[in-house]
A protein has these predicted regions:
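Bacterial N-terminal signal peptides that target proteins for export
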Residues: 2-12
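Bacterial N-terminal signal peptides
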Residues: 10-20
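Extracytoplasmic
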Residues: 24-237
Length: 237
């Protein structure tokens, strides 16, 4: 993402059996009883666990801190308060004291950033997202599922060189490695903007979910440098 190429890292992580939407199931266990994280809330968002079916925002990962709600490679937020200077605004300072790196989509700038002509889809303006991702990082999102069953999720993202993620549900493996396709576009003359070519991966993940509260864990497996914005879940057909 903007400015993050200064932290370029080459990672060699073997990937096995990458699938488009592997479903292994996720039986309930005592994970929820022992889990110390809590659903995200602040002065603007007070709706409790994010709803499925519906659009789940990655930036609304759980409260609880490092090792509980998330694991990040370093304690600094390289988006909020760093790239986006602390100026008292909600977006620039969003969760700036936490290790997960967060930014938001910016429109109307010169040159264009997230409303650029190289997008595969145009994201909403001022959309918060998790970025600066690196292999080995993860974050938890508590959700409330309306009805038990299998759900399919579309991922809104950018990735300048591809990568892979994996999902757990309630502490149990729920997918195999899922390939994220690169959004790199050689026709874009601005190298930093390779982190801002937005795309929508339809039916990116399928999860079998119980009714009620569950915790989704998103694991970054390979490459990193992806921006993960939303997962839009609906009942699988």
């Amino acid at each position: 993402m903007q400015g993050s190429f200064r932290r370029w890292l080459t990672l060699f992580v073997p990937l096995f059996a990458i699938t488009d939407a592997a479903v292994l199931g996720a039986p309930q266990n005592d994970f929820m009883a022992q889990y110390k994280g809590t659903p995200y809330h602040d002065s603007r968002y007070q709706d409790g666990p994010q709803k499925i079916p519906g659009k789940v925002l990655c930036a609304y990962y759980d409260l609880g801190g490092e090792g509980v709600a998330y694991h990040d490679s370093d304690p600094e937020n390289h988006g909020s308060g760093e790239l986006n200077k602390a100026d008292g605004s909600y977006l620039n300072e969003f969760r700036k004291s936490e290790g997960v790196d967060i930014s938001y989509t910016k429109f109307g700038r010169t040159p264009p950033i997230d409303d650029n002509p190289h997008n595969k889809v145009e994201p909403p303006a001022n959309l918060l997202y998790v970025g600066w991702t690196e292999a080995g990082e993860w974050f938890n999102i508590t959700v409330n599922v309306a009805k038990a069953g299998e759900y399919s999720g579309d991922l809104l993202y950018t990735s300048n060189r591809g990568g892979a993620v994996l999902f757990n549900v309630n502490g149990e493996p729920a997918t195999g490695p899922l390939a994220i396709h690169s959004t790199y576009d050689e026709t874009d003359p601005l190298e930093w903007r390779q982190y801002h070519h937005w795309a929508l991966a339809r039916d990116f993940v399928k999860l079998r979910l119980p009714k009620g509260k569950s915790v989704l864990t998103v694991h970054i497996l390979a490459e990193g440098h992806m921006n993960l914005a939303t997962l839009d879940f609906r009942k699988a057909e």
